[in-house]
Amino acid sequence: SIKDNYEKVLDCKPDMIVTCAYGQFIPKEIIDYPKYGCINIHGSLLPKYRGGAPIHWAMMNGDKETGITIMKTTLKMDAGDIIKQKSTFIKEDENLETLYERLSYLGRDLLLETIPTILNQTATYTKQDENKVTFALNVTKEEMKIDFNKKVIEVYNQIRGLSPNPGAYAFLEGKRVKMYQALISEKTFKGT
């Protein structure tokens, strides 16, 4: 982990450090070292969905919009000042994998726009509104399990928000079955 090997990072004498989907806290010695700072690319429009699964939860909650935030790295999870954000809509037929891919390109492009503003010291830094903070912690195994007592749209969003990995699941005849895709039908079906 970086906590155990941060001297190796500092030996590289970085002018700037960029992280994305790192999932660990970064030691103060690393955050404070680079001349131009330590920044993070995050898969949500902060302060909404701080944490390790922002894309999953945006889809599972049925959000219509999400985006990318580039922020200063701090000792507190995803709480740094916002440097730049870009939003995008979530397509109804999209799943976690396709949205993740689109956001990765959006993040790349936003990073390429942001770095020059940091280097020439024209970047603006906006504090996050702590009253609007929500969290997107990693999805638990229990949260992956489909509850067919929920509304159809909730089950649909759960399946697409976890597809293809880690995958929503249910039990059929005592066997665990992963669901990768769902369609909402206008017809009414009887069943148990």
Regions of interest found by a model, annotated:
Residues 1-166, 175:
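One-carbon transfer enzymes
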Residues 157-192:
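C-terminal accessory region of SF2 helicases/translocases
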